[in-house]
């Protein structure tokens, strides 16, 4: 059951190296603490190899790239591969600019990535060289819906097999595949889109799940997606008059903090294809 995955995070307290963006860095740190992990942030090229060496996994997020941070990503990634640590790539805004797209593609080509997690437009850009990324958000034209679900499942399965990485596409319907099995997940609330950084938070948390569950990375990735979506549902259910997106953000983090195996197993909404 997926609940075992979050219990393993709480037992092992995995230290995660995050090279993430400055928009959401604090929220990424807090959700890692909430799920039972431990965060450390560093993008400086002269620092990252030492930091990666003391951690269990690496979360690479390209949301606010600089020449220095790009160098740091490759240095940290090579060190993580050397140590056989899981690496997650979050290709934020791939398709929105040449720099983002090229950086994400080069990271895919030069590093062994455990998971690639993004919205459908970002993933389509990496897989097909096309996609209609709207800033850092997925375009509605790319959305995974009940009508397009079978096609989307086939797409994510094929890209996972081709890339050699688990691929997680998050949106109204989430898909997580290793090239063979595909989890179709229906947790979450549309209001989560009114909070910046829920995807970045998920990437950080998912990396902790990967570290703590080394024998089943696919299930760990799916469990992280269900945890985040279920936290969104729980947080929304606790809203009060006058609450806005800032309060909702905190309620999501609180819901992750209080999540246990039983709550996750009862609330996770998924099927495996």
Where are these regions (language model features)?
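Short, well-structured alpha-helical segments that form the helix of a local strand-helix-strand
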Residues: 155-160, 217-232, 252-253
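Charged C-terminal helix
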Residues: 230-273
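Conserved phosphate/ATP/ADP-binding segment of small-molecule kinases
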Residues: 100-182
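Conserved N-terminal subdomain of the carbohydrate kinase-like
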Residues: 2-89
